[in-house]
């Protein structure tokens, strides 16, 4: 037993030698375990890593052609290259309103959701802002895309926003060229007003005005408006939709051309049994200018709610049918009539112009040359405070508080027009007022938006 301790080291050495295959690996396998793999990329580039991409482009700087050899696909190579060259431009999420960012070299592109546009999808592209950049009418499609359209006689231009003439003499356009300085009128453009929500614009149109319209005034307003006071001489062909109505004795009212066969005017201008002659293309009523066209009226249609015995100026609008169609040219051109919504929108632009051959000052002489005048829209509260007479929902006020400029006697029935992006639309009919151009008083006009459906229905050309 004394020799037993010497056997223990021998036993342990034999055990270790017998387990060598489990402890020691060959060189190749040991290298695989001991070598730390390189984490050459942990970002978006990993999705592009294939084959020898690390050797070609990570450990060394590679060219586009070398990267192309790795991917063997131009599209994938391009996507990789955009990030490889200058980093990910989309990392800061520059696209707004749900836009999708696509990286590019030193740049990026936003793919915008429907209803938005701009470099970062920051612009509302619906009709509610600047009319969707449409030059006339705008509508939002079910998928919230803008659809621009034009009034009759126009077609969409190549940009799908502008409207260009589709006929020789489209409505609302002046085609006479002037050598003198440009004539300034009340031209307006679309602003950032919320046109998409027209509730406020037409609220007074849907107010129940039946009770008001059935009230009899204690006294009539002082004047039919048959004048433009403080205006300027129009050039020949500058207001080609303007007409003058002649009775058996003298000129007495104005009107506007709707189309070749129909004129719109004020209902209070009409007297039962009167023979009316319409003169279109007129400029100077004291001279023959060879631009005039004369037509007889064969039918008068006052609005069905007009009743002069109840109120001479409520629903003050009428249509005149001509015996022969007018020949349209640069001096005889219709005024444009939009739908109800846009007629209201155009009126709310706040600046229109009126025209006629009425008196050039209160109780003064009648104008020989056609006059025109810009008149600002007056808010309803101010309008109501300015007079003791009723201002119904089918009327509006326009003019200057300081006086001196207004429509006046002889201008009744003439057009109140708003010029939009170079095309003029009918927004009112000259109706009545107290004196002419008196301080604190305004001209009162028939609100055409209330009657556009009636106008279009009655004046269809067959």
From Swiss-Prot:
Calcium binds to the gamma-carboxyglutamic acid (Gla) residues in the Gla domain. Calcium can also bind, with stronger affinity, to another site beyond the Gla domain. Under physiological ion concentrations, Ca(2+) is displaced by Mg(2+) from some of the gammaglutamate residues in the N-terminal Gla domain. This leads to a subtle conformation change that may affect the interaction with its binding protein. Mg(2+) 3 binds at residues 75, 79. Glycans are attached at residues 78, 92, 199, 208, 214, 216, 226, 307. The lineage of its organism: Eukaryota, Metazoa, Chordata, Craniata, Vertebrata. The modification Phosphoserine is found at residues 107, 198. It comes from Rattus norvegicus (Rat). Pfam families: EGF (PF00008), FXa_inhibition (PF14670), Gla (PF00594), Trypsin (PF00089). Ca(2+) 4 binds at residues 54, 59. This is Coagulation factor IX. Residues 1-21 form the signal peptide. The gene is F9. Heterodimer of a light chain and a heavy chain; disulfide-linked. Interacts (inactive and activated) with F11 (activated) in calcium-dependent manner. Interacts with SERPINC1. Interacts (inactive and activated) with nitrophorin-2, an anticoagulant protein from Rhodnius prolixus. Residues 22-39, 186-227 form a propeptide. The modification Sulfotyrosine is found at residue 195. The record marks 185-186, 227-228 as: Cleavage. Its main location: secreted. SMART domains: EGF, EGF_CA, GLA, Tryp_SPc. Ca(2+) 7 binds at residues 86-87, 89, 103-104. The keyword Protease applies. Keywords: Blood coagulation, Calcium, Disulfide bond, EGF-like domain, Gamma-carboxyglutamic acid, Glycoprotein, Hemostasis, Hydrolase, Hydroxylation, Magnesium, Metal-binding, Phosphoprotein, Protease, Secreted, Serine protease, Signal, Sulfation, Zymogen. Ca(2+) 6 binds at residues 75, 79. Its EC number is 3.4.21.22. The modification Phosphothreonine is found at residue 199. Residues 40-86 form the Gla domain.
């Amino acid at each position: 037993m004394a020799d037993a301790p010497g056997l223990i080291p021998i036993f342990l050495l034999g055990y270790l030698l017998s387990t060598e295959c489990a402890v020691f690996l060959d060189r190749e396998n040991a290298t695989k375990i001991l070598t730390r793999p390189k984490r050459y990329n942990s970002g978006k580039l990993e999705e592009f890593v294939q084959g020898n991409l690390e050797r070609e482009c990570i450990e060394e700087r590679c060219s586009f052609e070398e990267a192309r050899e790795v991917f063997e696909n131009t599209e994938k190579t391009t996507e990789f290259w955009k990030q490889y060259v200058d980093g990910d431009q989309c990392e800061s999420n520059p696209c707004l309103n749900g836009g999708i960012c696509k990286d590019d070299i030193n740049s990026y592109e936003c793919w915008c959701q429907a209803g938005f546009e701009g470099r970062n999808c920051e612009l509302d592209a619906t009709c509610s802002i600047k009319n969707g950049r449409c030059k006339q009418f705008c509508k939002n499609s079910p998928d919230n895309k803008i659809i621009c359209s034009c009034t009759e006689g126009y077609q969409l231009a190549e940009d799908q926003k502008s409207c260009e003439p589709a006929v020789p003499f489209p409505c609302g356009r002046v085609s006479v060229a002037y050598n003198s300085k440009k004539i300034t009128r009340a031209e307006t453009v679309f602003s950032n007003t919320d046109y998409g929500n027209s509730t406020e614009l037409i609220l007074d149109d849907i107010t129940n005005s039946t009770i008001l319209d059935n009230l009899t005034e204690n006294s009539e307003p002082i004047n039919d408006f048959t004048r433009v006071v403080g205006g300027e001489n129009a050039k020949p062909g500058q207001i080609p939709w303007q007409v003058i109505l002649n009775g058996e004795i003298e000129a007495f009212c104005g009107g506007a051309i709707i189309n070749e066969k129909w004129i719109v005017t004020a209902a209070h201008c009409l007297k039962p049994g009167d023979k009316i002659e319409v003169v279109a293309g007129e400029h100077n009523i004291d001279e023959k200018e060879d631009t005039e066209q004369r037509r007889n009226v064969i039918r008068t249609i006052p609005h069905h709610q007009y009743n002069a015995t109840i109120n001479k100026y409520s629903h003050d609008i009428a249509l005149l049918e001509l015996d022969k169609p007018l020949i349209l040219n640069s001096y005889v051109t219709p005024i444009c009539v939009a739908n109800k919504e846009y007629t209201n929108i155009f009126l709310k632009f706040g600046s229109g112009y009126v025209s006629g051959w009425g008196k050039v000052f209160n109780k003064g002489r009648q104008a020989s040359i056609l006059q025109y005048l810009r008149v600002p829209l007056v808010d309803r509260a101010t309008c109501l405070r300015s007079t003791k007479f009723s201002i119904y929902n089918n009327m509006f006020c326009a003019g200057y508080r300081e006086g001196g400029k207004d429509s006046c006697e002889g201008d009744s029935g003439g057009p109140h027009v708003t010029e939009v992006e170079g095309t003029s639309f009918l927004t009112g009919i000259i109706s009545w007022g107290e004196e002419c151009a008196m301080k604190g008083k305004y001209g009162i006009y028939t609100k055409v938006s209330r009657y556009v459906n009636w106008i279009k229905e009655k004046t269809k050309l067959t």
